Every structure is written in C-alpha cells, then in structure tokens.
C-alpha cells in the first residue's frame, strides 16, 4: 500500500519530468492517463485507473503551448469529476494568463486571469495550488480555495549553498521590492532597487539604481524571466555602477524569443531558475543557466493538503530564514 493511499497525482504533457520528481518525493506512482490529441487537434484525455473517492491532484503548468496545456487541465478535471474523484486540486506551478488581471481605464481588453479562474471552477476543480502568482490579487478571482506558495525557500537554500561574498539583493523594479526585501531580510544583507520606466510591453529602460552596488555581488530576484530584456539591461547597469558579479534568481523560466541568447551574451554571471517550466534545449545547453528544483517543496505542499495540514506553515518567517521548512 502506498504511503498516501488516498492521494493520486496525474499530469499532462506540459512538464512530466517535474510530476515524476514530485511523486518520487511522495513515494507513490504517477496516475496513469492517456493524454493526446484527436486527428483535428482537439485534446483527448482518458483515465486508465480508478479514482473514485480519491484526493486527486492535476500537476500541470500552463506554460507554452498555453492553450493546449490549459485544455488538458480542464478536460482531465472533467474526466475526474465524471469518474467520481473525491476532491480535485489543480496544481498549476506556473499559472498562465496571469498578466491581464485588470482592465486599464479606456482599454477594451479582457481580464483573462478571471476568465481562466471561472473555467477552472466550471470544470469541477475544487482547489487550486500555484507557485509565485504574477499578481497576488488573482487569488480573489476564485470562489474556491487557492494556495499560492512561494519558491523563496528553494531559492534561499541554493543561495546559501553558494556562499557568496559581499552580497546585496537587488529588486529589478519597484513592484518587486516586497519580494526582494524578504530575501534580503532572510539573508541578513542589504537591498538595492532599480528604478526603471517601461515605455511599452516587454521593453524596459533602466533609469537609476537606488543603493550602493560597487564591489558587491548583486543578486537580482524576480518571479519570472520572459524575454530577459529587463534582466540584461539591469545587469549592465549594475556592472556600470561597479558591481563585481551579477546573479539572477527567478521562479519561472519563460525564456521567450531570444531570451537565452541574450542571457548568454549579457553581463549576467549566472541565472538560477526553478523547474515550474521545463527548460528548452537551448536553455539546458546555456552555461549561464542552472535549475534549482521545486519538486520537494511541491511534494510537501501536496502532502499537507492531502493530510489537512497547514500550508502556510511552510512559509513561516523563521523556518524560511533557516531553511527548516524544506523536506
């Protein structure tokens, strides 16, 4: 009998390697399902084992191809519901469609994050688990419980293992100050802020650096790296101000377009990301990019949800500061 007899984990095609690592930590087998496509491109899902009354988790990021991966979650949830699963949790480490979380004044645009929340709920999902939401307020778009866990303990563990000298934490923009301040506090080090203005989407201009980075090892922390334009410009600005080294730690490795090439040819000494999104072949081959797995943290979170234990306990300030929250 498995260690967690009522817990089952299924996955789609988005990130099967992460799912395998999570169930390995839980000492259970990955749920068997046939996930593919019909000849016309429609998503096809069939569960290959009994789920009646079980506590089921669908572990799947909605990274690219975003629409296919989202539809796999929705169709799998429907299949689980019709097969009488006891509880269905969508564990979505990277929650796509999170960037449109409001309707700017006079703009005729959707609030896509709310739309996706409605779709997940309508499909029969009882609970959502995600990692480092792009905007915390998205939790309020759901009428079901949402656990937004943080990759901070995983990243801090990796940072401490590197034993960096003369470290200073850098927020890449004003919006990331809360995250950067929490990391700086846990590491008992200084904080710097990059003040930038973004003239249009995915284009950033570094304007000013608040804090003295001369001769320091600069640690940029962010929730995601998309095109890497902002990150590379920030690294150049820090080096121009006398930074000795520039490192970047981020949760989600989106790496759109020429992001990997930009990182490879930039002033960044090392980029560390988690495995919420699988790396492309180019990213895996890049010597400047390294992965710190979040599988252990996700496994412990799933275990706690299954056993009705506190999830917020994992992010107790003292435990995070010492690394004791990780399994």
UniProtKB/Swiss-Prot annotation:
Q: Which reaction does it catalyse?
A: D-ribose 5-phosphate + ATP = 5-phospho-alpha-D-ribose 1-diphosphate + AMP + H(+)
Q: What is this protein called?
A: Ribose-phosphate pyrophosphokinase
How is its cofactor bound, per UniProt? Answer: Binds 2 Mg(2+) ions per subunit.
Q: Where in the cell is it found?
A: Cytoplasm
**Pfam families (alphabetical):** Pribosyl_synth, Pribosyltran_N
Q: Where does ATP bind?
A: 40-42, 99-100
Q: Which gene encodes it?
A: prs
> Which residues are involved in binding Mg(2+) 1?
134
Concerning NCBIfam families, the annotation shows:
PRK01259.1, ribP_PPkin
Please classify the protein's predominant subcellular localization into one broad category.
cytoplasm
The protein's UniProt keywords, in alphabetical order, are: ATP-binding, Cytoplasm, Kinase, Magnesium, Metal-binding, Nucleotide biosynthesis, Nucleotide-binding, Transferase
Binding of D-ribose 5-phosphate occurs at: 198, 222, 226-230
Q: Which domain of life is it from?
A: Bacteria
Q: What is its EC number?
A: 2.7.6.1
Q: What's an example GO cellular component term for this entry?
A: ribose phosphate diphosphokinase complex
Q: In which pathway does it act?
A: Metabolic intermediate biosynthesis; 5-phospho-alpha-D-ribose 1-diphosphate biosynthesis; 5-phospho-alpha-D-ribose 1-diphosphate from D-ribose 5-phosphate (route I): step 1/1
Q: Where is the active site?
A: 196
What biological function has been recorded for the protein in this entry?
Answer: Involved in the biosynthesis of the central metabolite phospho-alpha-D-ribosyl-1-pyrophosphate (PRPP) via the transfer of pyrophosphoryl group from ATP to 1-hydroxyl of ribose-5-phosphate (Rib-5-P).
Cofactor or coenzyme needed = Mg(2+)
The molecular function GO annotations come to: ATP binding; kinase activity; magnesium ion binding; ribose phosphate diphosphokinase activity
User: Kind of enzyme, top EC level?
Assistant: transferase
